Each structure stands twice: as structure tokens, then as C-alpha cells.
């Protein structure tokens, strides 16, 4: 399995006041919703502002230190973090999973940018930054499909490995399962990827909200790819073999991309606004908060 790479960079506003809470085992958890708008050029040449809301968490002592800084809703921050995959048993039965942002660092900006008032009572930052870079192995053979308008779309799921030491000093490995969506030429150019292939994906982090068959509101997080690099098999492997996975398939989206080859890979520009579950009418990230696990007690830090 390729040695994983997992980076998230956000610049946005705190949509509301952050919160500090404690798990049943006494672990501090600092939680904030960082919100902004991405400015993208569509396939038709028009500029669009795509709103996003991402839940960000800091754990342990750093959470308490962050809380002491007394950040409040409307403050602009820069976040450096990683995508964190969690899976747990749902109270109603069955397994549930979620991907959210684990912040490694959060700093307040020295200037106050333009804020957009949200009808739901929060704010988001105009001209924000939302960048993701992940490297891992494809977990299953992707299938290309086409929208009624003829746009190609490819859904990829990759396994990103993370090595760390637990509280007892033992070396551990954890795998994060990340879903990504590729559009148009980018999808066509990457349709030959196969299970186990190492791949690097760059893009923007988006949320998608939907209602399940039981009427419950759900939320998922994925990467909308802007550039993908297929890597040589065996390069940068931390060990031999492949970690199989069966994460839930991503939902259908409504965005597209125009792509061009760059340095052996392909880079794309998103066009029409994606169904991110973050409409400008409110703090829609709240719709799927039940998708997040209630405790972080099993985390190693």
C-alpha cells in the first residue's frame, strides 16, 4: 500500500461560536464550523461562488489551548489539518461512517475579510480557500457514467494509510477511506484506474446532504477533484499488499469539469455548482450532524 498523504487547508470564517466539550473519558474536544465561498470558473466561462461549511475538530490538550483563545463566530481563521475517517455502530443498528476535518493547527487572520450573512444565522467568508491533497490506493474498480447532459463522471474511493504511536507508545496504523468525484475529461482520462492503483488527488472539499429512505437527514464529505495523478505501482510503498475496503458509494452530484493534461496527470476546473449540502440559505452542515460519532474516546491523541 502506498505511503499515504493527507492534507487539508482551509481559510474561512467561523460560522458561529466554537464549542469546547468533553467526552465520557474526559477528553477535550474543540469543535468549530469553518465556512466560506469558493470562486470557480465554470465550463461556460462564468464565475460562480460555491458556499461550503466544514466541521473542524481539535482533540486533547490542544483543544483546551484553542478554547482559551476565545475565538467567536465571524472570526476568520486558517486551518491546517487532515481528513479523518470514523466508523461506528449506529444506535438503530448497522454501521455508520463519516469523514471530517481533524485540525492540526488553527490561527486567526490578522485582517477581517468580507463576510456574507447566512439566513440560518451564521456567516461565511467571501474569497475563502478550500484545498485538499490526498494520496492513497484505489479501493475498487471505478465505473464511469454519464449525466443526461452527456458529462462523464467517475467516482473514486481511495484508502489513505496513517501511522502513529498510541498512548502506550506502540506503533499503529489506521486507514482513512476518502471518496472523490472526477468530471468530464478528468473522468475520461482516469477511467482505466484499477483497484490497488496508487493515486494522488487534489481538489476542494465539499459536503453533500440528502434524506435517506427513513426520512433522516444525512451528510457526507468528499473531494471534488481538480487534478489527479496516477502513480507507478510499488513507488513509495510502506509495505506490500493492499488493504481492501467497502465504503459507501458516493451520491450523484451535479457539477462538471473541463480538463487539460499537466505533467503527466490531468487538471480540471469545476463548472456548475455542486450539490454540496451547503446552500446559501442556512447552516446546512447541521442537517447531517447525526452522521458523526458521539465520542472520540478511542482516538490515540
Curated annotation (Swiss-Prot):
PROSITE patterns hit by this protein: SSB (PS50935)
UniProt record, GO biological process: DNA recombination; DNA repair; DNA replication
GO molecular function, one term: single-stranded DNA binding
Keyword Transmembrane part of the UniProt annotation: no
Ranges of Polar residues composition bias in the record: 264-278
Locus of motif Important for interaction with partner proteins: 296-301
UniProt keyword DNA repair, yes or no: yes
Composition-biased stretches (Acidic residues): 287-301
Keywords: Cytoplasm, DNA damage, DNA recombination, DNA repair, DNA replication, DNA-binding, Repeat
Phenotypic consequence of gene deletion: Essential, it cannot be knocked out. As SSB levels are depleted growth slows, tolerance to ionizing radiation and UV light decreases rapidly. Cannot be complemented by ddrB.
Biased composition (Low complexity): 238-260
Description of what induces expression: Constitutively expressed, highly up-regulated following ionizing radiation for at least 12 hours (at protein level).
Oligomer and partners: Homodimer. Binds ssDNA. Interacts with DdrB.
Protein name from the UniProt record: Single-stranded DNA-binding protein
Amino acid at each position: 500500500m502506498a505511503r499515504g498523504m493527507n492534507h487539508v487547508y482551509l481559510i474561512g470564517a467561523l460560522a458561529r461560536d466554537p464549542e469546547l466539550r468533553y467526552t465520557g473519558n474526559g477528553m477535550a474536544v474543540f469543535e468549530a464550523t469553518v465556512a466560506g465561498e469558493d470562486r470557480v470558473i465554470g465550463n461556460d466561462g462564468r464565475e460562480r461562488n460555491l458556499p461550503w461549511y466544514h466541521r473542524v475538530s481539535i482533540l486533547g490538550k490542544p483543544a483546551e489551548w484553542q478554547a482559551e483563545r476565545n475565538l467567536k463566530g465571524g472570526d476568520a481563521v486558517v486551518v491546517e489539518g487532515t481528513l479523518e475517517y470514523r466508523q461506528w455502530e449506529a444506535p438503530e443498528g448497522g454501521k455508520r461512517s463519516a469523514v471530517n476535518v481533524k485540525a492540526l493547527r488553527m490561527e486567526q487572520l490578522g485582517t477581517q475579510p468580507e463576510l456574507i450573512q447566512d439566513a440560518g444565522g451564521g456567516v461565511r467568508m467571501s474569497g475563502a480557500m478550500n484545498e485538499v491533497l490526498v494520496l492513497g490506493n484505489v479501493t475498487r474498480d471505478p465505473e464511469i457514467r454519464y449525466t443526461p447532459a452527456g458529462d462523464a463522471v467517475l467516482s473514486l474511493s481511495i484508502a489513505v494509510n496513517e501511522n502513529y504511536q498510541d498512548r502506550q507508545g506502540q506503533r499503529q496504523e489506521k486507514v482513512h477511506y476518502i471518496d472523490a468525484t472526477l468530471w468530464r475529461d478528468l473522468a475520461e482520462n482516469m477511467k482505466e484506474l484499477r483497484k490497488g492503483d496508487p493515486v494522488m488527488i487534489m481538489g476542494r472539499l465539499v459536503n453533500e446532504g440528502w434524506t435517506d429512505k427513513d426520512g433522516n437527514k444525512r451528510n457526507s464529505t468528499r473531494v471534488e477533484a481538480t487534478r489527479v495523478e496516477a502513480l507507478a505501482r510499488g513507488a513509495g510503498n510502506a509495505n506490500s499488499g493492499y488493504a481492501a475496503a467497502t465504503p459507501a458509494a458516493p451520491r450523484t452530484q451535479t457539477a462538471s469539469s473541463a480538463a487539460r493534461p499537466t505533467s503527466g496527470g490531468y487538471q480540471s476546473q469545476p463548472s456548475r455548482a455542486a450539490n454540496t449540502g451547503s446552500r446559501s440559505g442556512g447552516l446546512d452542515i447541521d442537517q447531517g450532524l447525526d452522521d458523526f460519532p458521539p465520542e472520540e474516546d478511542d482516538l490515540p491523541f
